[in-house]
Amino acid sequence: MRRALIILLVVVSPVFAQVRKLHTRDFTRLSQVQVGEALKQTDVIFIPVGAVETNGIQPSNRDYTWPLAYAKLMAEETGGLYMPGLMWSYPGTTSLAPSSIYSTPQAGTAFLKELAHSLLRQGFRRQVYISASHGPAPLTVGTLVREFFEETRVPILYINMDTYLPRLQLTAEQRSRTIYGAHSIAGHIEDLPLRGDYGAKESEPAGAIPANDGLTALGRLGFSGSLTLGSWVPDVMSHGGDRDLPATSAERAAWAKLGEEQLRAIIKKMRMPEAMDALRKHDRYTQELIVPKFFTKKP
């Protein structure tokens, strides 16, 4: 009788295996056991891409923190995971500044491609890369998704929030405090300065900046931008500054609360669960119809 009971317990115990519930959707903070369990439910993962560059008196990693917050909220909305991605992508016009980390678009693409191949091997087939408030990002991430598809025949997705957000037709008020919400979600709210943290002299360019009439004219004609023309900022303080600052830490916290609400509303409007289902269907169509028709060898 005792032997039969032991055998029964051995057979039944795997059914009642105890696994800690997800305490976060950050892939890097989960255990091997948790990741394995998560992969039984989803193959979706979100990866932010940004830059560390001068933003005047604002944090130099601002344009990474924004997509990081989007990635976290998208993971929550879809039941997927998210993870740190590429913080050091090509900065573009700000590369001359002491706080700007320079890396070529090709180096960024190569790094992300290694990451994408690893994630695919691990079981994350639906990968979503996100950038926000960073004009040169498509040079890195757009190349990634196309080259990765040609190499693996697996479609991964790039969401450029700068070009996507206009589709939602948001008012300025509906996105007025998202930068504060993003830093709060990322746990970096104290990085955003308060009014009076910097003096007037330290908040402005070192002196008068002569007008670049040629660049101004090209912009007016529609022939400028990070993807179309080489240029640098004329002063390290002339990029990304914000004079609308909270007066107190309490006001900053209130702006952060509002910003989080705005970001969550944006994610709802994006209909990410529907998008992830569509990505799965597109992948299946590719594998079942297009690949057999045009390829005889595995990638």
Question: What positions do the PLM features span?
Answer:
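Positively charged n-region of N-terminal signal peptides that target proteins for export
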Residues: M1-A4
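Extended, histidine- and acidic-residue-enriched regions that form the cofactor-binding/catalytic faces
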Residues: Q18-G80, P84-G92, P98-Y102, A110-V128, ...
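Hydrophobic h-region of N-terminal signal peptides that target proteins for export
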Residues: L8-A17
